Swiss-Prot record:
GO molecular function: RNA binding; rRNA (cytosine-C5-)-methyltransferase activity
Protein name: Ribosomal RNA small subunit methyltransferase B
Provenance organism: Escherichia coli O81 (strain ED1a)
Gene of this entry: rsmB
EC class name: transferase
Positions of the catalytic residues: C375
Length: 429
């Protein structure tokens, strides 16, 4: 049976679920994409990601174009108009087609009586586009970030906040990790070249390759065979600091979806790895990654604050703690983060990180290494978190990453084309 649905209305409903109900786009989008034809999957993703990336602008424009906001059962129409505006501003879809499909979306969401309103608002925008955009570009909304986050970035990075914001608003590059147990990076790059694609090696991370143009994973040489994995370069940097060795007992805590678990096993295939995550659903992706790469690890569901519940008194040679965080370093990859996070989340996350660090430290052997990592750019979750931990933990010593006054290494979004990421390497005396 042919799959045929109104993509604009589907995108509007997905965006509404993110903004109004706090649902993650990575949970909402895949089931929706199963309902449309293969050729429409990419457009549905573009509409959802694009609207969430530029939501501040689209909201600002609607407030200028409409006397009253849409509320109640008509709220989905508000997001449908956003989808229409996004197409007119940012896509190559011919304006007449963008308008027609968006207006028709009102029928799909059972609001056919509002077709005229949607058409009128979008046509009004076309007439006033130049003057509206000039006014918008002089407003604070042009940064496309919620005000609470903008204030935190300005405080933490008085010289760099604008470049962080600009990087967050870009489309991310596609980074891959070559499985060194199958191929050297150079030999896999040669296979990529034979397949008619270009890739570039990262200067610092030995397995990392950036694709010149993002591609579907099934087009990548050996993806199904486990020769290559999609993983941002900054996330791959964790292995530089962890430096896992064969024969060691290694804990990957907060492990889902398993990208770092499998990287540990690529670097040290004879290591004994325990992968733990609190989210049982996301652990299924750890199993999937291990299966595709043909690797074995022990996988458990567990809360990082209570390690004795899932590992007893076990001690580890190395621990990778990829701590739960605000994810403010990966906004370009997950633009819904801007609208899912709240200012009050930051102290709550910092408290959780602190509790996990304290709990897991007793399970690290003397002389062992713990790498604390986040995909955040906020000091409360990163340098300040580690500074406080070092002050209260007599047998913890910072190694290779920063100074006791400014602990850790902070990668900012877009630096060397990678995501925003923080690492601190700690040794137990």
């Amino acid at each position: 049976m042919k799959k045929q649905r109104n993509l604009r209305s589907m995108a509007a409903q997905a965006i509404e679920q993110v903004v109004e109900q706090g649902q993650s786009l990575s949970n909402i989008l895949p089931p929706l994409q199963q309902k449309v034809s293969d050729k429409d999957k990419a457009l549905l993703q573009e509409l959802c990601f694009g609207v969430l990336r530029t939501l501040s602008q689209l909201e600002w424009l609607i407030n200028k174009l409409m006397a009253r906001p849409m509320t109640g059962k008509q709220r989905t129409v508000h997001y449908l108009i956003m989808v229409g505006l996004y197409q007119l501003l940012y896509t190559r879809i011919p304006p007449h087609a963008a308008l027609a499909e968006t207006v028709e979306g009102a029928v799909a969401i059972k609001r056919p009586q509002l077709k005229g309103l949607i058409n009128g608002v979008l046509r009004q925008f076309q007439r006033q586009q130049d003057e509206l955009l000039a006014e918008f570009n002089a407003s604070d909304a042009r940064y496309l970030h919620p005000s609470w986050l903008l204030k935190r970035l300005q405080k933490a990075y008085p010289e760099q906040w604008q470049s962080i914001v600009e990087a967050n608003n870009q489309r991310p590059p596609m980074w891959l990790r070559v499985n060194r147990t199958h191929h050297s990076r150079d030999s896999w790059l040669a296979l990529l070249d034979e397949a008619g694609m270009k890739g570039f090696p990262h200067a610092d991370y030995p397995d990392a390759v950036q694709l010149e143009t993002p591609a579907p994973v099934h087009a990548l040489p050996g993806f199904e065979e486990g020769w290559v994995t999609v993983q941002d370069a900054s996330a791959q940097g964790c292995m530089t600091w962890l430096a896992p060795q064969n024969g060691e007992h290694i804990l990957d805590l907060c492990a889902a979806p398993g990208g770092k678990t499998t990287h540990i096993l690529e670097v040290a295939p004879e290591a004994q790895v325990l992968a733990v995550d609190i989210d049982e659903q996301r652990l299924s992706r750890v199993y999937d990654n291990l299966k595709r790469l043909g690797m074995k690890a022990t996988v458990k569901q567990g809360d990082g604050r209570y390690p004795s519940q899932w590992c007893g008194e076990q001690q580890f040679d190395r621990i990778l703690l990829d701590a739960p965080c605000s994810a403010t370093g990966v906004i370009r990859r997950h633009p819904d983060i801007k609208w899912l996070r709240r200012d009050r989340d930051i102290p709550e996350l910092a408290q959780l990180q602190s509790e996990i660090l304290d709990a897991i430290w007793s399970h690290l052997k003397s002389g062992g290494t713990l790498v604390y990592a986040t995909c955040s750019v906020l000091p409360e979750e990163n340098s300040l978190q580690i500074k406080a931990f070092l002050q209260r933990t007599a047998d913890a010593e910072l190694c290779e990453t920063g100074t006791p006054e400014q602990p850790g290494k902070q990668n900012l979004p877009g630096a060397e084309e990678g995501d925003g990421f923080f690492y601190a390497k700690l040794i137990k005396k």
